[in-house]
Amino acid sequence: MKVVNVPSNGREKFKKNWKFCVGTGRLGLALQKEYLDHLKLVQEKIGFRYIRGHGLLSDDVGIYREVEIDGEMKPFYNFTYIDRIVDSYLALNIRPFIEFGFMPKALASGDQTVFYWKGNVTPPKDYNKWRDLIVAVVSHFIERYGIEEVRTWLFEVWNEPNLVNFWKDANKQEYFKLYEVTARAVKSVDPHLQVGGPAICGGSDEWITDFLHFCAERRVPVDFVSRHAYTSKAPHKKTFEYYYQELELEPPEDMLEQFKTVRALIRQSPFPHLPLHITEYNTSYSPINPVHDTALNAAYIARILSEGGDYVDSFSYWTFSDVFEEMDVPKALFHGGFGLVALHSIPKPTFHAFTFFNALGDELLYRDGEMIVTRRKDGSIAAVLWNLVMEKGEGLTKEVQLVIPVSFSAVFIKRQIVNEQYGNAWRVWKQMGRPRFPSRQAVETLPSAQPHVMTEQRRATDGVIHLSIVLSKNEVTLIEIEQVRDETSTYVGLDDGEITSYSS
C-alpha cells in the first residue's frame, strides 16, 4: 500500500490553467437551445473563461456574402447570427477565443471542404477581400462590445493547417501568407488586440519553429503560440458509427511531454516568452470514439488537469458538449462524442472529473502521478485521486494511505466517487440496452448517475488525519476535509434517544 505524508505547507500554487478555455462544436450550433443548456450547466458547475470553436466565417453563420451591384460582385457583411452567438456567450460569463476560419464559399479559391457541414479549407481567392473581412469583423466586435472587452479576447488564425484535410495541400508558405495578412488586419484595427497561431496538431512541430522565425524575419505580429494535443493512435477498427483507437502506453505523460516540447521550442525561438495555448486536447481526435464516454477518459484527463498548467498558459478541452456535427448529426445518445455533457444534458464521467478539480484550492501541498492535495483559503483540504487502468479485467484496485496535517481537531470528511459504477451515465445507458433515441423516461433516469457520496466525522490525532483509500478501476475521487463547527449544544433538550430506533 502506498503511504503519502502530505506536507503541512505548500511551496507553490496550483495553476488552474485548464479553466482558461473550453472547446465547442462549430459556432452556428450556438443557435440551438440544447447547446446553450449544456453551456449553462458547464458554466454553473465548472466556469470556463473562454470558448473556442470552428466556423466563425463559414456560411451557416452568414457573415460573408457577395451581392451584385452595378454588375460588380461586392462584399456584404451580416452580423445577425454572430451577434446572437456572442451575446449568448457573454450572458453565460464566457468570452470568445476567436478562430478565424473556415473560408466563406464566395471568397474561396477552391471547393475542398471538411466535415459534414462542409467547412471550406482553401485559401482566399482575393487576399484583399479577406483582409477587409477580418477588419470588418473585428471592427464590428469593438463597436458592439467595446474596445476594453475585445482587448481581452484572443484571435487565432485558422485550424490545423499542417493537415491536408484542414488546409489545401497543408501548404506551409500559403498559411504563413494567410497568417500575415490576418494578423496585420487585426492589428490595423487596434494594436493591442491579441493574435496568434499556427494552431497545428501534433506530429509537425517544425511548423512552430518555422512559424516563429517567419514572424521574426517579416516582423509579423504574434502574441501567442497555439497547438493541439491528442494521444490516440491510428484506429485499429472503423465502423459506420465508431472509431476504436488504442491510447499510447503512458498517455498522460505523453501529452504532458507534448506540452513541454512545444514550450521548449518557443524558448529557443526569437520570441522566447510568448504564451502557449493548447487550443484543443483530448484522448482521441475522433468525435465517434467511445472512450470519451467512459470513466477511463475521466481518469486519464485527471492526470493532465493536475499538471498541465505547469507547462502551458492554457489547455482547452475539446469539447464541452456532444451537440457537435463534424461526422454528421449524432446517431445515438452516447456515440463517442468529445463532449463533457452528452445529449439531453447528461453529464459524463469526465464532466465530474472537471467539477472535482474545480473544488481544489490554490495552495499545492502534494502532487504525484496519481493524486493532488491542496489547501483552500479557508484552511480546508481538497484532494483528487485517480486510478487509471489501461488493461482489461475486473479488480485492479489501488490502495493509498494519506497522512494529512490539519489545524483543527473535529473534522468533517466528504468523499465523492466516479468510477465504472458511479457517476457513469454511459454504464446506465448500456444497462438499458443502448437505446439509440431513448424515451423520455430513460432521459429522466440517466442524469441520476451522479457521483457516489460518502461522509464521516472524525477527530484529528496529533494534528493529522489518517485516511485509507481504496480506488477502484478508473476511479476519480474527490476528498474534502473541513473543520466541524459543532452547534449541537445550542439545541435545548436535544436527545436522539427519544426517537424510535435511535440512541443518544
UniProtKB/Swiss-Prot annotation:
InterPro entries to which the protein is assigned, alphabetical: GH39_as (IPR049165), GH39_cat (IPR049166), Glyco_hydro_39 (IPR000514), Glycoside_hydrolase_SF (IPR017853), Glycosyl_Hydrolase_39 (IPR051923)
Classification of source organism: Bacteria, Bacillati, Bacillota, Bacilli, Bacillales
Protein name (Swiss-Prot/TrEMBL): Beta-xylosidase
Assigned protein family: Belongs to the glycosyl hydrolase 39 family.
Species in which this protein is naturally found: Geobacillus stearothermophilus
Record keywords, A-Z: Carbohydrate metabolism, Glycosidase, Hydrolase, Polysaccharide degradation, Xylan degradation
Catalytic residues (positions): E160, E280
PANTHER family, A to Z: ALPHA-L-IDURONIDASE, BETA-XYLOSIDASE-LIKE PROTEIN-RELATED
Underlying gene: xynB
Pfam families in UniProt: Glyco_hydro_39
Catalytic activity: Hydrolysis of (1->4)-beta-D-xylans, to remove successive D-xylose residues from the non-reducing termini
